[in-house]
Amino acid sequence: MYGSSNYKQEISLGIDCGSKMIRLSATTKAQELYSAEVELRNDIVNLLSTRKQYRKTRRSRLRYRKARFQNRVKSKNKGWLAPSIENKINTHIKIIVDLHKILPITNIIVETASFDIQKINNPDIEGKEYQEGNQLGFWNVREYVLFRDGHKCCVKGCKEKVLNVHHIESRKTGGNTPNNLITICEKHHKQYHEGKLKLNLKRGESFRDATFMGIMRWTFYNRLKQIYPNVKNTYGYITKNTRIVNELPKEHRVDARCISGNPSAKPLGYWYYIKQVRRHNRQIHKAKILKGGKKKLNQAPYLVKGFRLFDKVEYNGQIGFIFGRRTKGDFDIRTLDRKSISKSANYKKLKLINTRKSLLIERR
């Protein structure tokens, strides 16, 4: 009535960045206005590795193909990042852009982290020891792994002398790092791959998430700064101190509220769980060729009885998402944490709430 139409409260957005999850909290000094957790896609590495495997096999069947060298994208494009990392950075930015459409955010505070992986492995490391890794003095990884395991098979009581180095997690996604390799004799190695022997093996600690945070940290911050100039950076120790001073519990969404700079703001009382899914399965046929040289389709119909995969629906008063479809019209309905609502819900009993998006949203 008295010139208040142009007045806007200052809203701060706190973002706790992550490799698997993003936590967000938008607050004023008095009230929390938005709280969410976003689950990022972690299937991209496996999908790209599988695609690479099929591509190499396909090319190997073409004998006259010219050798391909010096064709690496990384060497051509400065600032190139792996698709899995690029996707996660873009999702961080997309979430923030979408939130600006519903709230007049004035400040953005981002918490990122850098990890000293060498220090995690060895807290006492210093100086030139950073350049003297575990494999110093060994010809290759295989020689180091054999030495580390005492040139003995991992199967208890085995005294076979012909030894192999086995990947605990598939090399396709696990790589050739020593903590993913173990010594096993040729006899037991063959039995294991034939399914005749079971081994309870767990790979050593993986630093994928720590590596990702180190790569994405400044790239994300600088890209976001180009879109919104009012971006500030903060650190984990500051968030921890804020949480302790205000006697708040250790929860990720609480951390996001502390990052926003308003730890004493009244909690919203509910929050949103957001899950990112891929939009399309671009593999046309299954890799396995059936009898008669036939190829089986790897893609389901776009619509089944008017519904798509991951459509948000209501069934018997419960809200869920379509996780599976059958052509006769019976669907698998679940919540985003995969809790089953119905394994065979008839399409006639479903009420469409929202068509599928790349970001599925569930209020909790």
What are these regions (language model features)?
Residues 154-183, 194-197:
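Histidine-centered nuclease catalytic patch
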Residues 101-107, 136-164, 185-188, 308, ...:
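Short cysteine-rich loop/turn motifs with clustered Cys
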Residues 6, 19-21, 27-136, 200-306, ...:
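Substrate-contacting helices/loops that form the catalytic groove of nucleic-acid
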Residues 1-11:
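A short acidic-Thr-Gly-centered motif at the start of a beta-strand
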Residues 24-26, 331-337:
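SH3/SH3-like beta-barrel fold
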Residues 339-364:
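Intrinsically disordered, low-complexity, charged/polar segments
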Residues 311-312, 318-334:
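Short beta-strand-centered aromatic/proline hotspots
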Residues 10-18:
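Two-metal-ion RNase H-like nuclease active-site motif
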